[in-house]
Structure formats: C-alpha cells, structure tokens
C-alpha cells in the first residue's frame, strides 16, 4: 500500500464530431490516506473520509485531429503537480468507489 503520491496514468480524450480518441500520459494523484472511524457512533457523529487529491494542478491542452469544421478541436485536462490527503472536492474530483477507467474510448483510438 502506498501513501498519497503522484503517478503517471494513461487517459483518453475524445469529442463529438472528432473521429478519433487520443490516449496519452499525464500525472495524477493516487494512494491511500489514513482515516479514523470511531468505535462508538451516535447520531451526532460525523464521518469524514480523506482521499488522495490534487494539492497543485496546472491545465494542459491538446488538439484532437480531423475534427469537423466548426468543432472546437482542443481538449484541456488537469496535470497533478502535487498531492495531499483532504476531503473530496466534488467540483473537480471523482469521489466514487468505482468509476470508469480513465483511458476508455468510444471511438477509434490513437496514442500520442
């Protein structure tokens, strides 16, 4: 088991009206965070689950090839610069137990 840290991951980018899906590598946050669950729980007990999440991020942009005219061919994605354990921030994090793999493509796939 690894504590919260940066790791490379393959993700995918695709859009409507662009015929291909591009897979590429970026950095993500992954690993475990210590959580304490009280032995005695009451209705007033609060439970807070820490997750490994972004501390600092930047955004990079790639251009999807062969998009139809009038389609924005650019895809912007987060790049993790540092990670830490904190409460899940639903505005930019996937806090589900099981989500789809980050490199799922619905269209023809190419790698860069």
Swiss-Prot record:
InterPro entries: Cystine-knot_cytokine (IPR029034), Glyco_hormone_CN (IPR006208), Gonadotropin_bsu (IPR001545), Gonadotropin_bsu_CS (IPR018245). Gene3D superfamilies: Cystine-knot cytokines. Transmembrane segments: none annotated. Disulfide bonds join 4-52, 18-67, 21-105, 29-83, 33-85, 88-95. It is found in: Secreted. GO terms for biological process: G protein-coupled receptor signaling pathway. It comes from the Eukaryota. GO terms for molecular function: hormone activity. Heterodimer of a common alpha chain and a unique beta chain which confers biological specificity to thyrotropin, lutropin, follitropin and gonadotropin. This is Lutropin subunit beta. It comes from Aquarana catesbeiana (American bullfrog).
